[in-house]
Amino acid sequence: MPIWVKDTRKEYALAPEGLHQAVCVDVVELGLVKTSFGDKHQIEIRWQLDVEDEGAGLRPLVRRRYTLSLNEKAKLRIHLEAWRGRKFTPAELEGFDVETLVGVNCQIQIVHTLSDDGRKWANVESVVPIGKGMTKIRPSETYQRVKDRNKPGGQVDADGEAVPF
């Protein structure tokens, strides 16, 4: 008997275009990722916006992948320096803990783009500090960091055998 599987692509509400106040809610280590420039160690920074999705009543989550590099041409460095409002010092370039970004407010520019298959995406184009006098926002209590979510495996079935997923 066949077991059918099909594409169940779900449509999500896009984060609105424009400049929005946001708070960093997560930094996810992706490990080595195949890119057009070869295998690169990447991270994903995730932000929640200060607006609510009208349909779900949740704050939109946007994300951007970065190669884990502070090279002067690296998008991560460009965005971090803009976000911090200053250049890295030589000492800071020796090592910067990206985990310190969690909980930090900023403003992000969202731009909508179309992919090759015609889907629309909300992309983080730029990151800048919050303006003077702006009230800081906090991550919503419903967001759970990726590293804190239940990991698959580690469970046993009724016979005491390890479940591999």
Label each PLM-derived region with a short phrase:
Residues 1-165:
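Short beta-rich binding modules
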